[in-house]
Amino acid sequence: MTKKLHIKTWGCQMNEYDSSKMADLLNSTHGYTLTEQAEDADVLLLNTCSIREKAQEKVFALLGRWKKLKESNPDMIIGVGGCVASQEGAQIRQRASCVDIVFGPQTLHRLPEMINSVRGTRSPVVDVSFPEIEKFDRMPEPRADGPTAFVSIMEGCNKYCTFCVVPYTRGEEVSRPSDDILFEVAQLAAQGVREVNLLGQNVNAYRGETFDGGICSFAELLRLVAAIDGIDRIRFTTSHPIEFNDDIIDVYRDTPELVSFLHLPVQSGADRILTLMKRAHTALEYKAIIRKLLAARPNIQISSDFIIGFPGETQADFEQTMKLIGEINFDISYSFIYSARPGTPAADLPDDVSEDEKKQRLYILQDRINQQTTAWSRRKLGTVQRILVEGTSRKNVMELSGRTECNRVVNFEGSPEHIGKFVDVEITDVYANSLRGMLLRGEHQMALRTLETPASVIERTRKENELGVATWLP
């Protein structure tokens, strides 16, 4: 009988990536297959996020429902991972004794051993340590799921912004060796992946070791990934303005595979608030980065993050944020009302902005961002956009759906043979959350690179030692 695994994921793209790796790992070691139904699973895993308010309450509410499932199936194993697990540790079991495993973002690779231990001893396991880069060394080979894929290049953050829990839950910055990343990307490309999204809490701080003992910068890594045949689009998430240097901007100038869309969080447009947040840059310095980016890539679109109602934020501070939004002309962006995260420096500041004021400011900001986002979408009307076709449309299975460089969903009529490939589409309609277009040409009519397949690169460089363990020679 097939063993089933159910994973519930909350939070950022890094959590989504981690969950996919958990599924791959447990499939390779224990033969678990994923199920959408928690009641059908032998193992339930909750991958948590602690960024938002009441994160802990949300966790224990779900665990309360899972407890009932375990009462009817005592052999079921329940595990809690992610950032809430890293923060709370063994305290999770004090409130929810049904939990068998508590693991952090840096120990998910130990899940097979943890499950074996629970099965063998019926005793709970708690491991929220920070064994640095070890988790990447013990992951199975990547499995593509469509033409796009996430690839983690680093973990943690050293910036210690006063509102953020990441350094405390994921640890400080640790970069993967560049050759490991390139090999993973080549493996994904060999499986049909055309677009990769490089992941990290602060990707532009990447400093990975090379095969000869040197250090690879983020700008160098971007160019190396772009050189892999089959990879025609590169995105990255997320970056910090303080380390967005000229070398990275130069990549936008000379590497067309890097998309003309950038998510660069600013959080506030008021220097006083940026100082309280310990962001280490001013609004003027942020605008200088954008100015250089536009000089290198005039058609680039910028999205960002904003925190509303940070302790001490005045109406004048908020107006500075609104001014910055207008000056930059941000595209799709994310905004949140400030809520204190336990253990962060900002949690000790007086939360002196009323809830009504926070909500009013959030409404004003989101309304302005929505206006700008709509304007950006309308500019696409009548233009020809290159789309990476991801599959059939969610709303109409007779249509195909894909994304532009600027991350807009485009639906159009076309045959299934285009799935996983690029097409050129003329935009004919603009909607609130998507675009519609007419197919003009398929990939066979484009001049995309076909010099050497990723599979041939892997085969040519793959070596095995006397134990039969495969290695890759750069």
Curated annotation (Swiss-Prot):
Domain MTTase N-terminal: 3-120
Cellular component terms (Gene Ontology): cytosol
Function according to Swiss-Prot or TrEMBL: Catalyzes the methylthiolation of N6-(dimethylallyl)adenosine (i(6)A), leading to the formation of 2-methylthio-N6-(dimethylallyl)adenosine (ms(2)i(6)A) at position 37 in tRNAs that read codons beginning with uridine.
Keyword tags: 4Fe-4S, Cytoplasm, Iron, Iron-sulfur, Metal-binding, S-adenosyl-L-methionine, Transferase, tRNA processing
Protein name (database record): tRNA-2-methylthio-N(6)-dimethylallyladenosine synthase
HAMAP family: tRNA_metthiotr_MiaB
Disulfide bonds, paired cysteine numbers: none
Cofactor binding, per record: Binds 2 [4Fe-4S] clusters. One cluster is coordinated with 3 cysteines and an exchangeable S-adenosyl-L-methionine.
Species per Swiss-Prot/TrEMBL record: Erwinia tasmaniensis (strain DSM 17950 / CFBP 7177 / CIP 109463 / NCPPB 4357 / Et1/99)
Binding positions ([4Fe-4S] cluster 1): 12, 49, 83
Domain called Radical SAM core: residue spans: 143-375
